Amino acid sequence: MIPRKRYGSKNTDQGVYLGLSKTQVLSPATAGSSSSDIAPLPPPVTLVPPPPDTMSCRDRTQEFLSACKSLQTRQNGIQTNKPALRAVRQRSEFTLMAKRIGKDLSNTFAKLEKLTILAKRKSLFDDKAVEIEELTYIIKQDINSLNKQIAQLQDFVRAKGSQSGRHLQTHSNTIVVSLQSKLASMSNDFKSVLEVRTENLKQQRSRREQFSRAPVSALPLAPNHLGGGAVVLGAESHASKDVAIDMMDSRTSQQLQLIDEQDSYIQSRADTMQNIESTIVELGSIFQQLAHMVKEQEETIQRIDENVLGAQLDVEAAHSEILKYFQSVTSNRWLMVKIFLILIVFFIIFVVFLA
């Protein structure tokens, strides 16, 4: 092994490594002569870098605790706001119910307009009785349904009135009264249309009787038809003994068929008028309920009016007291003298000491 000589003073400075060491290869003779002077050098130490998968750790427990505390306070804030959220939810439910009732009212108004157009027709041959009866039945069912929905909405307002404010409850009652007034107006229009339809049916019946009475009276019945015997009006005796044709039998059958048709028509019109009368009676019950609701609102308005009158009396009493005090102040001459003296003293002080 060939010994090497390291120049430590040139490559290190107070224990700091300055770079690669400079070594010098010595000959064997030189190595033998200097072996007594230089001790053998230790093997060079190689620096091993840390493994790449090793990571530094940091304690983040406090951050986790602070995040938990913030989440807990947020949940507590949500719990404290639950009454407000409940009130908003109830208000939105009331709004949806009122919106649904308003939409149903508009649809029923459209059906009522169509029924009005059909009911005002006075033509005898352009009478759409089936369509009119269907629309009448549908509108009657819609009015009953709307009446029930408005009653449910009013019960909802009464049940939730204690939880909401006074102004909010007044606004809700105003909306309910507005819907009730619209339903009453529509019911009144429906009643008027049914009355017009009844008058038209009476006119059509009288006109049909006028047109059908003359042929019925002009064509007499055969005397043996109701007795069940054979109808024989006459037969001519010819030499060829031909069979006589009975023409009166066909006329009599047509006459009876016409009478049956008239009876069925009159019966159908009677049923229609009965339905109209029952519908008018139901509308009367709806008007009674509406009158009861309006009576309740009238009592509320009377209480508000009494409160306004009481407040007005209090304001007038306060005004009279203020006038009395003002008169007493103006009549007090000593007070005016004192004020005048204070002004004079203030003027003298201002002129003498501050000028």
UniProtKB/Swiss-Prot annotation:
Gene Ontology terms describing biological process: early endosome to Golgi transport; endoplasmic reticulum to Golgi vesicle-mediated transport; Golgi disassembly; intracellular protein transport; positive regulation of protein catabolic process; regulation of Golgi organization; retrograde transport, endosome to Golgi; retrograde vesicle-mediated transport, Golgi to endoplasmic reticulum
Main location as per UniProt: endoplasmic reticulum
Motif IxM motif in this chain: 245-247
Annotated localization: Endoplasmic reticulum-Golgi intermediate compartment membrane; Golgi apparatus membrane
Biased composition annotated in UniProt, kind: Pro residues: 40-51
SMART domains for this protein: t_SNARE
Record has Transit peptide as a keyword: no
Highest rank taxon of the organism: Eukaryota
Biased composition (Polar residues): 28-37
Regions crossing the membrane: 334-354
Effect the entry attributes to changing I245A: Loss of interaction with SEC24C
Induction conditions: (Microbial infection) By human cytomegalovirus infection.
InterPro entries linked to this entry: SNARE, Syntaxin, Syntaxin-5_N, Syntaxin/epimorphin_CS, T_SNARE_dom
Pfam (any one): SNARE
Keywords, comma-separated and alphabetical: Coiled coil, Congenital disorder of glycosylation, Disease variant, Golgi apparatus, Membrane, Transmembrane, Transmembrane helix, Transport
Segments in the Vesicular topological domain: 355
Regions annotated as coiled coil: 287-318
MF (Gene Ontology): cadherin binding; SNAP receptor activity; SNARE binding
Region (Disordered): 28-51
Database matches in SUPFAM superfamilies: t-snare proteins
Function: Mediates endoplasmic reticulum to Golgi transport. Together with p115/USO1 and GM130/GOLGA2, involved in vesicle tethering and fusion at the cis-Golgi membrane to maintain the stacked and inter-connected structure of the Golgi apparatus.
Pathological condition linked to this protein in its record: Congenital disorder of glycosylation 2AA: A form of congenital disorder of glycosylation, a genetically heterogeneous group of multisystem disorders caused by a defect in glycoprotein biosynthesis and characterized by under-glycosylated serum glycoproteins. Congenital disorders of glycosylation result in a wide variety of clinical features, such as defects in the nervous system development, psychomotor retardation, dysmorphic features, hypotonia, coagulation disorders, and immunodeficiency.
Quaternary structure, from the entry: Part of a ternary complex containing STX5A, NSFL1C and VCP. Identified in a unique SNARE complex composed of the Golgi SNAREs GOSR1, GOSR2, YKT6 and VTI1A. Component of a SNARE complex consisting of STX5, YKT6, GOSR1 and BET1L. Interacts with BET1L. Interacts with BET1. Interacts with COG4. Interacts with GM130/GOLGA2. Interacts (via IxM motif) with SEC24C and SEC24D; mediates STX5 packaging into COPII-coated vesicles. Interacts with VLDLR; this interaction mediates VLDLR translocation from the endoplasmic reticulum to the plasma membrane.
Protein name, entry field: Syntaxin-5
